[in-house]
Amino acid sequence: TDEYKHKLDEATAAAAINELGLPLDFQTATKKVKESYATYRDGLEIFAREYGIPHKDLYISYHNYKKKLVSTIKPYDGLLEKLQTINCPQYVFSTSSKDICEQILKHIGLYDFFKGRFYSVEDFNVYKKNESSEVYQKVCEQINTKPEDCIFIDDSYSNLDFAKQIGMGTIRIYYKNNSTKDMKFIDKAYKGIYECIDGLKKDYGC
């Protein structure tokens, strides 16, 4: 949700100041995170470019703070039951650490549901987000499925671009207004997870 995204921005800013020792106040650091997303599609990238911090160090410090947010996530009522009605195998691919992602999946009651789970760092040694489409190709190879037979779903449009580059179908979930109407690498956009599930059935026959 937008509220959770705001918390992630603040966690990124706090990590930059408290763990990496950057000479910034909290407001300035948070502003830089938002600027980084807008410019590089990655909230950490600006700190790598302006302060020379390795992406691995940025990744680790950010996830140290992200751990504190897991308990604040509110599970969607009946989401597991809704996902079980989709007639196709479903996988998780995340740029978050395996530890945090699995904590989140357990917290929201979906840990045992997905057919497989893949993590950009632990499985593919990729610390920097949105650098190439290679990691998406590797996920398709792992599940032995052609990209054109996959649908990649995300609420972050920046993750959808590279998925589309290798031929995957792409769906964006948004929460308030669809701000990506003119982005050609997004096939469909649905408001919220429930509308997305309904759309998968209606528009894709899942």
Give the label of every model feature segment.
Residues 57-64, 68-71, 79-108, 118-121:
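Substrate-recognition element of Asp-dependent hydrolases with the DxDx(T/V) motif
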Residues 119, 187-199:
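Short acidic-hydrophobic, aromatic-tinged amphipathic segments that line or gate anion-handling sites
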Residues 91, 97-151:
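Substrate-recognition "cap/lid" segment bordering the active-site pocket of phosphatases
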Residues 147-190:
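Acidic, Mg2+-coordinating phosphoryl-transfer loop and its flanking beta/alpha structural elements
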Residues 51, 86, 113-114, 166-168, ...:
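Short, structured coil segments at secondary-structure junctions
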Residues 46, 100-104, 162, 199:
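Phosphate- and divalent-cation-binding pockets in alpha/beta enzyme and binding domains
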Residues 1-77, 99:
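N-terminal helical cap/lid subdomain that shapes the substrate entry/recognition surface
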Residues 56, 112-120, 167-174:
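Short hydrophobic/aromatic-enriched beta-strand-loop microsegments
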